[in-house]
């Protein structure tokens, strides 16, 4: 036994010496068990290159216990951003590269499954697997909104308009909805997009004043010929009415550009004609909203991946309303909130994301954007805007990179 032990010690010592001398491995990288299997090959990297490529992790980022934003492991310790350090993050990597299964899932597991609940979260959960794996079923502090699952929560788009809201609040809340649902995919379309938003805002204000809820208002817009609807509303309105200034300029117009604006509006709203969406926004008795965070809740927007293209307007609406509400959050709040926007590059343009990244750190709100590459992001945002997005994210995690510019 003694001879075997001596042979084993000699074998591992030789292999570790070889790894240091010929492979460029650092002495402080040698751990228990290293050297049992020899590292083959001659010197591939100089010690200087290895130090540059694999720098030591600062002790402040290391933890024995999983907590905060989990980035990985180093020498049997977790590499994490402490929960009290509020940074924005972007996670890049193609499909199957581990964006969801590593940083996103590990971070949420460390928060919910361990029972720490150090932060609340708003998470876009493509496939619906994140909340299933990271939270306990029937947790009263976790709200799951899934338009394809009628046992989940709905969404209250008019959450700010209950009671007796002022005219200014009505306009502000409805303009947020318009900006989220009707978006530009081409800078040349700005004229049509802006006018479609104005038209939609005016019609929503009119129906809200008539006592209609959000989903019924949208479907009345979809079910009626827009030009005749606006003409009828204006003929029965006074210039002092709240909706009048939004709709008057469209009444009686017959040029083709107005028709294009109307088409832009109805195309953007077509998803609300589906029965699952009507149930989510109207009939579901339990609805989540950005006010749910004030009650200590976390929200997961879950959706099957094959439905993402059809329902991305819904995800965008809920996300933009949440971003705007976070901007109104008091700086005195002590509980951090983590906003996870998975598949950010596939959701369409979010106007509020730039302000969010610029202002939310002071509100103890951290934004985490996950997308495939800068090239994917530049399909929606300009090259300069994409640079602004990434520069505002202090922590960048690259799981995979095939695009040279990324």
Predicted regions and their residues:
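Short, intrinsically disordered, charge-balanced linker/junction segments flanking boundaries
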Residues: 1, 100, 175, 404-406
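Acidic/polar loop patches that form or flank catalytic/metal-binding clefts of enzymes
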Residues: 276-278, 368-370, 398, 405-406
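A short beta-strand-to-loop transition that corresponds to the Sensor-1 phosphate-sensing loop
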Residues: 125-127, 370-374, 401-403
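Conserved P-loop NTPase catalytic core
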Residues: 384-406
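P-loop NTPase motor domains
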Residues: 70-75, 80-365, 375, 383, ...
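Basic- and hydrophobic-enriched, low-structure N-terminal and domain-boundary segments
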Residues: 1-97, 101-109, 114-116
């Amino acid at each position: 036994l003694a001879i075997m032990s001596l042979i084993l010690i000699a074998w591992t010592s030789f292999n570790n010496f070889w790894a240091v001398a010929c492979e460029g491995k650092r002495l402080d990288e040698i751990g228990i068990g290293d050297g049992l299997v020899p590292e083959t090959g001659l010197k591939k990297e100089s010690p200087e290159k290895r130090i540059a490529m694999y720098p030591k992790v600062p002790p402040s980022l290391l933890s024995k216990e999983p907590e905060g934003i989990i980035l990985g492991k180093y020498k049997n310790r977790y590499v994490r951003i402490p929960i009290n350090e509020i940074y924005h993050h972007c996670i890049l990597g193609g499909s199957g590269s581990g964006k969801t299964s590593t940083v996103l899932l590990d971070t949420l597991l460390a928060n919910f499954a361990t029972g720490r609940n150090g932060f609340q979260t708003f998470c876009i959960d493509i496939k619906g697997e994140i909340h299933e794996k990271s939270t306990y079923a029937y947790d009263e502090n976790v709200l799951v909104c899934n338009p394809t699952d009628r046992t989940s929560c709905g969404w209250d788009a008019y959450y700010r308009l209950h009671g007796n809201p002022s005219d200014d609040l009505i306009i502000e809340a409805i303009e947020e909805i318009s900006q989220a649902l009707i978006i530009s995919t081409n800078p040349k379309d700005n004229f049509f997009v802006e006018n479609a938003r104005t038209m939609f805002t005016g019609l929503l204000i009119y129906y809200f004043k008539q006592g209609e809820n959000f989903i019924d208002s949208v479907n009345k817009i979809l079910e009626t010929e827009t030009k005749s609807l606006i003409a009828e509303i204006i003929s029965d309105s006074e210039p002092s009415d709240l909706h009048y200034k939004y709709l008057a300029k469209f009444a009686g117009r017959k040029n083709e550009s107005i028709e294009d604006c109307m088409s832009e509006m109805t195309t953007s709203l077509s998803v609300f004609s589906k029965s699952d969406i009507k149930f989510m926004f109207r009939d579901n008795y339990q609805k989540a909203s950005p006010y749910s965070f004030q009650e200590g809740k976390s929200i997961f927007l879950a959706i099957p991946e094959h439905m993402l293209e059809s329902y991305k307007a819904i995800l965008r609406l809920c996300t933009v309303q949440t971003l705007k509400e976070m901007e109104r959050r008091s700086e005195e709040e002590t509980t951090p909130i983590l906003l996870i926007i998975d598949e950010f590059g596939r959701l369409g343009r979010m106007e509020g994301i730039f302000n969010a990244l610029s202002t939310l750190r002071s509100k103890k709100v951290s934004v985490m954007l996950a997308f495939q590459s800068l090239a994917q992001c530049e399909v929606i945002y300009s090259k300069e805007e994409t640079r602004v997005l990434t520069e505002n994210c202090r922590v960048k995690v690259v799981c995979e990179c095939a695009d040279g510019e990324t």
